[in-house]
Amino acid sequence: MLDTAQDADVIDQGAFFACKVTEVEHFTDDLFRFRTARPATLRFRPGEFLMIGLEGEKKPVLRAYSVASPSWDDTLEFYSIKVENGALTSRLRHIQPGDRVLVGRKPTGTLVTDALKPGKRLYMLSTGTGAAPFASLIREPGVYEQFDEVVFTHTCRTSPELTYSRDLVEALKTDPLVGEAAAGRLIYFDSVTREDGPRTGRITTLIETGELFERIDRPALNPETDRVMICGSMAMLDELKTMLEARGFEEGSNAKPGDFVVEKAFAGEGV
C-alpha cells in the first residue's frame, strides 16, 4: 500500500506540522526564501511569526521566523539568512522542494496593526531579513484600508541583498488582489550601507538628518499622524525606539495599542 501520510503536503505531528517545501530561491550567498504547504487550520495575522525548524538528533531545532506570505495565501513563505555554524540555518540553507520543515501551530508577535492606534501613514522600517513581516503586510488589502499611505524601507549592506524586497514591490504592481490598492499609496525606499549607490546610509541616520523624508517628499515623523513598525538588528531596534520616544511616540502592544511597535523575536544573526 502507498503511504498516503508521507505523500501528504502537510502532516500533523501534534505540536508541529511537517510541511512540504514547495519552492526555494537563493538571492545571495547569505539570503534565501522558501515556501511550504500551508496547514488548512493555520491562521495568522499579517506580521506575526511562527516557530519553524528541522528534526534534530534528539529533538527539533526551532527558531522564530516571521511569516512573509500574506494571510490569504495558500502557502507559507519565509525569508532567511544563512549562518554557516547556525544550529538551524546551517541545515535549512540546503533544503530543496519536497523536503519537510516543521511549522509551529501558534502564531504570535507585535508587528500587527491591532497593536497600533489609527493613523494616516504607516512606516515599516526594516534591515536585512527584518523585511519578512512587512512582505506579508504590504500584500494585505486591509492595510491599505487602515492607512492612507504605507512607507516600506529596507536597508542592507549591499544592493544584491535588497533583491527580495525589490522583487516583491515590483510584483505588487500587477498583483490582482492588492495591486490597485497599493498603487500610489505604497512608498518603497531602500538604502545600502557598505557600497556606493543612489541611496546610502543607515535608516537611523536617514531619519535623523531628514534625508529620508526629503527623498520620499513627506513630512518628518509625527505621532499625531504616523505609526511605525520596526524589525531588524537589535542595535537598530534600540536606536529607533529611543529616537521615536524622544519625538513623543509611545510603544504599543496587543494589549495596549500605541504609536509604534518593534519585533525582537525574528530569525536574525547567529541562528
Regions found by a protein language model. Give the residues of each.
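Short, conserved phosphate/pyrophosphate- and ester-handling motifs at nucleotide-, phospho-/glycolipid
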Residues: 47, 130, 233
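Ser/Thr-glycine-rich phosphate-binding loops at phosphate-binding pockets of nucleotides
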Residues: 127-133
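A short, basic/flexible loop-to-alpha-helix module at the beginning of a structural domain
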Residues: 107-117
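Histidine-anchored nucleotide/phosphate-binding helix
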Residues: 133-145
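Ferredoxin-reductase
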Residues: 2-99
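Short helix-loop-beta connector
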Residues: 116-121, 223-224
